[in-house]
Amino acid sequence: MKYASFLALVGFITSTSAIGVSGAAEGFAKGVTGGGSATPVYPSTTAELVSYLTDSQPRVIVLTKTFDFTNTEGSTTATGCAPWGTAPGCQLAINQNDWCKNYQSSAPSVSVTYDNAGVLGMTVASDKTLLGSGSSGVIKGKGLRVVSGAKNIIIQNVAITDINPKYVWGGDAITIDNADMVWIDHVTTARIGRQHLVLGTSASNRVTISNSYFNGVSSYSATCDGYHYWGIYLTGSNDLVTMKGNYIHHFSGRSPKIQGNTLLHAVNNYWYDSTGHAFEIGSGGYVLAEGNVFQNIKTIVEPPVGGQLFTSPNSNTNQACSAYLGHVCQVNGFGSSGPFSQADTGLLSKFSGKNVASASAYTVAQSRVPSSAGQGKL
């Protein structure tokens, strides 16, 4: 009996000591440590998870199950609108801040019933690591918010799903706004009402998004075709964003939209299957795209480009990257996709002196990303 107890104790210690962040952030959030060497904690209830995320202590928070927030804060029935029609596959809109009245005044009014927990995500305080264990760490019905000066945060190997998918303004999966040093890695998002990822108008500074799976398959969409429109929105006033090794699948727009004052390094990602556009670049959006794969993307970048774009068009032009990124930029790969050729070399100097992610040939992303991105793929 004592021997069996000893073995159980050894097993627990081994399991606990093995918990930790896998790898390290590349690119702009290089050096992020999250909760560091804090003793791991294992929430068992939604309330306990919220408490660990919001307190002032450095934390390593390990998720070993699904935390379902559905119905934890009740529901609301109200009058919304139907900007894209009332067909079964069309999203409806919650009238948040009189959005229907101010922006969709001609849309018919409809009754909407949504889950309150999804509308506003959980706040994540500074110095936190949020880790999923294996394929078990799931947050359902509520997102995460890194805001109000929060910094030094790692979110790894977690799935965020089912946030009022029928309704625009039903909630975002991950919000970052007025933050710094945030690393999102091996995260899966699916069936989200609004944005899968949004960086708000305040400065979010240094952010790396890597090896994540943004899944746009949905029963409801603004384009009424099962392709989610509200993908990734980067609109901060002073943002440096690295996107590397992500799988961006089944969207019809905003994947990503970039504006404000945002420098995006999109490297070795895989865009697959879009009925609309991938990039939407507004004023103040600066995008360098290299070593990516675009497969079945009808419109890679929506015209006109309001900011600046360097698409790494050919080996000769790509030599210009060396002086600022420390490597020759890699060409992108295309299959059944629209054109993507622009070379605003002036934006390259913005990378000078910064932590820049390495780049591989697009064939590496083509072979690895679909099978390695997202939760449970560490």
UniProtKB/Swiss-Prot annotation:
Keywords: Carbohydrate metabolism, Cell wall biogenesis/degradation, Disulfide bond, Lyase, Polysaccharide degradation, Secreted, Signal
CC terms in the record's Gene Ontology section: extracellular region
Reactions catalysed according to its record: Eliminative cleavage of (1->4)-alpha-D-galacturonan methyl ester to give oligosaccharides with 4-deoxy-6-O-methyl-alpha-D-galact-4-enuronosyl groups at their non-reducing ends
Signal peptide residue numbers: 1-18
InterPro entries to which the protein is assigned, alphabetical: Pec_lyase, Pectin_lyas_fold, Pectin_lyase_fold/virulence, PEL
Subcellular location: Secreted
Family matches, as SUPFAM superfamilies: Pectin lyase-like
EC number: 4.2.2.10
A molecular-function term among this protein's GO annotations: pectate lyase activity
Residue positions of the active site: R254
Single biological process term from Gene Ontology: pectin catabolic process
Pfam families linked to this entry: Pectate_lyase_4
Chief place where the protein resides: secreted
Keyword Secreted: yes
Entry-linked Gene3D superfamilies: Single-stranded right-handed beta-helix, Pectin lyase-like
Disulfide bonds: C81-C100, C90-C224, C321-C329
Function: Pectinolytic enzymes consist of four classes of enzymes: pectin lyase, polygalacturonase, pectin methylesterase and rhamnogalacturonase. Among pectinolytic enzymes, pectin lyase is the most important in depolymerization of pectin, since it cleaves internal glycosidic bonds of highly methylated pectins.
Similarity annotation: Belongs to the polysaccharide lyase 1 family.
Name of the molecule in the record: Probable pectin lyase A
Organism the protein comes from: Aspergillus clavatus (strain ATCC 1007 / CBS 513.65 / DSM 816 / NCTC 3887 / NRRL 1 / QM 1276 / 107)
Taxonomic path: Eukaryota, Fungi, Dikarya, Ascomycota, Pezizomycotina
Gene: pelA
